[in-house]
Amino acid sequence: MRATGALMIVAAALLGAAAACNSGSMPPGGAPGAASAAAVDTLRGTVAVVGAAPVTRVVLRPAGGGADIELVGAQRDALARVAGAEVRVAGRHTRGTASAPALEVASFAVTAVDGQPAVDGRLEREGGQLVLVTADGRRIRLVQPPAALADLVGGRVWVAGPLDREPQAFGLIEPRG
């Protein structure tokens, strides 16, 4: 009986040491521990909307592979609008609506669409020109923007393609508001 108790103490100590080394990423089992649930994590992947109405979920398909991660919180609807885009999301691990791991998203940025690099931000008109203002305050003057893009001034949009040429694609993330 004493050997079994000592073995359990050693096993508990090893588990505790392993948990202390956690960098905030999702453990292989998919359920975050108490320490990682409070940690902010940044993930990259492709957004997808899965399921059938009225029970759809917005998920991140991680760039490195692995299980889908449900994206929840105030950014959910904006993320649904960029389904198919590659994004970088930041947030905290939490419980989702399904058995899959979930991330309560605090912020995100569109990084690529259809294999083309992309940037997102608020669209402004400045002296007759369209300017994209990124989350970090960078101001990017858009070269030969399509006329339809002007209708989105005041909203958050993504623009794909080289920034020194006409945008190859664009889309709405959040309407002006």
Where are the model-predicted features located?
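Bacterial signal peptide processing site
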Residues: 22-24
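Structural detector for short beta-strands of small beta-barrel domains
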Residues: 37-54, 113-127, 161
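Beta-strand/loop nucleic-acid-binding surfaces
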Residues: 66-80, 137-149
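OB-fold/S1-family single-stranded nucleic acid-binding modules
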Residues: 94-114, 164-177
